[in-house]
Structures are given as structure tokens and as C-alpha cells.
């Protein structure tokens, strides 16, 4: 069945994940509607509620800190509430009953209240979204919700900020309860033929250490299983944060880069504050609701080929995408970019270009993949971070491989014109293009105001996303290494910097063996 199990680590990933799951839920169709082109069995698991009714809940494991879940209950409307008497009334070693102290429950958002009552919800805005659960449209299985009670969200006395804190917490809980066995194995073992795991995680705080502990354990447990990790963070780019914390974020992100870049099948770093943005994007980088929405468009589009039914082009599973960008098996870090457009405007432009091409007797408007210069360009670069460090100025970026996904009439070459990653005699970068027969839906839980495309009244977006391995990845890794070698202690420096150098060198092999790395002085 090619199932995918999703792991979400931390507040940032859950803002993104909520948008992602809302989008998946919107693809469900019911008779007499036509069958959805999306195979829901890949991401959703069937079940039976206590009342005997059928349920369909995400194959997801969601971690967050105490207080970060908002009004979300572990036991929701699909399942009976647990009877507290089963705990309080059973005999124990103490002669008297325990006194249970409960925190004041967080009231649901107005949006959630309307959904619960079957009413059309009001429009959301930055001030009305307090928690990621405030705009969730999906019910989760109780086993999907995992609260880390050791830390409170936004706790200034004991913040969950340092990479080592997250790694240490994972190791502690793994020794005590075997997290993988308790939390993840039930989801994996109910799959008929799992396609892989996808991880959404923060990387520039303690969640990076938590995710690193997880992925090392996953590699021990599941060997060569496909694991895609999407690493989210400011990585020191948020000027509103104090200097000391920004420097700590950069160290955290570098430690995450080393471990996740080495252990993941594909690791995609995503900046919360993209350096390259188009004029049609109005993003409030201080709002995780905004940031998660933009990230969800790209992530959901980039991987949609792995969820489509085979009858509508579902041939690009996670392994196919990996093979395209990572021909050596060692270039695991990908540069992610995308473009967004109004589908009606895009179709009009496409028709005009085709008409003009036919009139002149040529098809010059069609793109080819003969060399790097003729690869598609994108409007939004969520990978590159301007570290203002020594860079390979004057050297042209060399592309090794790229996987692209398009939704809408983007005027690209047909799939069968793309270069086959399995053909070693092809010259130039390997390239695979996948098309999806559905546009990205703009739901009422989505901040539609961040885009100024078309009339502004559309309910869907056209998306073109690309994941690339190129020498630009090595440039970013080396820039990170140059900075963190001045920030970390001698004991950690050698192992961390050597690990980063090894990752960067994979993008030199067969192309350019030179490096910009300096010796420690």
C-alpha cells in the first residue's frame, strides 16, 4: 500500500503539520463525487470508534511541550473520554486517595467552536490564532498525541532551547520507556508495505537534538528505510531575538545539520525567513501560522506524487525522488525552492505562449534540460541563508540532480523528456518532473492574505516546487562551518566541523575538489 508515517517534533512543526493535515482532509470525496486522485490510505489509518463507527485518522505521531497543545484534547469526539475512576479508585500503596490537581483548561478558539457546532467558521487572523490546534480541522487518534511534560512551552526559567537538552531528554525517555517501541512501532507495524517516514522538526532549538536522537535510533531499528526530514528554523536570522540566543540557534542548527544530514535519506533545511521572496508574497515571519502556511504549500506539493493513485500519475514515490537528487547515495541534503501563481492567470499565459509558438512555427517557449542554465528558476528560495561568510564567489552553481513537481500550467517539458537518473550516459544534471492533477486548495484555515496573485478571490493555487542537489549546498554547509568553529568549544569543534566538512565534500566529488575551509588557527 506504500504507507507513510509522519513524525512532528515541536511547535513550529505542528503549525506546519496542522496546515498539512487540513489539506489532506480536504482531498476526501464522498459519493456522488468522483474518486479523489489522492490515495488516502497512504497517510491515513482506518479504525473503529467505541460506538462502532468507522474512523480515518492520520498516521502521525505528534510531540510538543506541556501547554503547547492549546484546547486540543488527547481524547476527542471520535473516542470516549477516559473514566478517571479507573485510576483514582484502584487500590495502591497509599492508604488514602491521591489528590489530583488539574490546570485550568484552555478554551477552544471561536473557529473551533464553530466547527464543533457545524457552523461556518469565522475568518482567522494572526491575533486569533493562539495555538496550532486553534485552526485544526482533523481528528487524531489518541495515540498520536504525545506531550513532553518535562518542559513547559515558553518557560523562561527552564527553556527548551539548547540542542543538548533535547538530545538528553530523548536519551532519558528512551532508556525509561523505549519511545520507538511504545510510540512509533504500533503505527509502523499496522502498515502493509511502508514507503517511509517523514519528519517535521525544529532544528535550531532543543527539538533539533530531540530529532537527532530519534533519527539515530530509527536507523538502528529500521536500517535503510526511507526517512525524509524537513528541518525548520530561524537559524540565527531573526533580528528580534537577542544576540546570544541567535548565536545559540546557529550552533543548534549546525549540530542538527551534521546529524540529520548524515542519517536522513533526504534532509531539507527550511528557513522561517526566506532570503529570496517575490513581490506577491506578504509574509509575517513572526507568525508561525503564516510561516507554517507557506512551508506547507511547498512541502505538500513536493511530495504529492508519493500520495497519488497510480491511475493519475502516482509513480513518484519517496524513493523515486531520492534517486533523482542523490545519484551517489551520499548527497542527502537538498535545496528547496518554489513558485506560486494564480492558476487562471497561469493558464491564460500558457495558452498565449503556445499560440505564439505555433504561429512562429517553433516551440522555443518550451524548456529543456540540456544544461544547468536551462533548468527552471523559482521565485522563493527557502534554503539559502546569507551567513556573510567566505563563499565561492565567481563560481557557477553546478546542479547534480533535481526533482520537480508542478500543479497547474507551468509550461515545462513533458515528464518523458526529462533526464533519467538511472541512465549513467546522460550528460548534465539528472532531472525528473512530476505533475499533479489537483491544485493546492486555499482553505478557510489558511492565511490567504499572504499572497497577492490574480484577483485574490481564487480558492486554489498553482505551485511549482523543486528539490535540488548542487554545489550551492556545499557552499551553505561551509559557511555554517566557518561560523560555528568560532562559537563552539574546543572539545566539540573538531568533531562538529569535521562532520560538516565531510557532508560538504560529497558535493565536490567528480566536480571540484577545492574547498574554502580554513584550518583552525
UniProtKB/Swiss-Prot annotation:
Keywords: Mitochondrion
SUPFAM superfamilies assigned: Tubulin nucleotide-binding domain-like
A matching Pfam family: Tubulin_3
InterPro entries the UniProt entry points to: Beta-tubulin_BS, DML1/Misato, DML1/Misato_tubulin, Misato_II_tubulin-like, Tubulin/FtsZ_GTPase_sf
Any one of the GO CC terms: cytoplasm
Localization, UniProt: Mitochondrion
GO biological process, any: mitochondrion organization
Function: Involved in the partitioning of the mitochondrial organelle and mitochondrial DNA (mtDNA) inheritance.
Family: Belongs to the misato family.
Protein name: Protein DML1
